């Protein structure tokens, strides 16, 4: 059975760990940086003889339309954009503490800019949090921390 996973290093590691947690594969120790061309080298045992195929992250949801593709491990942002809902969810990351954060960053010489301050203020409002909660329906959680 063909399964599509992300072809970038960090998301590929996440996908492989999900497949391992689901009991479909056993992994070797993963290196700090993964390569799509080496995906089979990361797998110690392929318990279900899966054809694990790395593709561009933004193409995984579309790969589900391929009758030869058994399943795909889709990031929440792309799943939502493709109209997938929790009804299609078969498994998810086992670690509830796993967090992928988006960071607003600027050059040091711009940190005191009024435009940057206005942007930070706009992005960290209760209105923005409500929009994220309503739009992403719990798949993305707003959490605002000012680091500097």
Where are these regions (language model features)?
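Periplasmic-binding protein-like
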Residues: 13-20, 123-144
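Short helix-initiation/N-cap motifs at beta->coil->alpha
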Residues: 32-62
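A ligand-binding cleft/hinge motif common to bilobed small-molecule-binding domains
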Residues: 61-88
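Short loop->beta-strand "edge-of-pocket" segments that line small-molecule binding or catalytic clefts
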Residues: 1-12, 23-28
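A bilobed periplasmic-binding-protein/Venus flytrap-type ligand-binding module shared by bacterial periplasmic
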Residues: 100-114
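Short beta-strand->loop
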Residues: 51-53, 70, 85-97
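Alpha-to-beta junction loops
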Residues: 1, 24, 47-50, 66-74
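Solvent-exposed loop/turn segments at secondary-structure junctions
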Residues: 9-12, 58-60, 77-81, 110-111
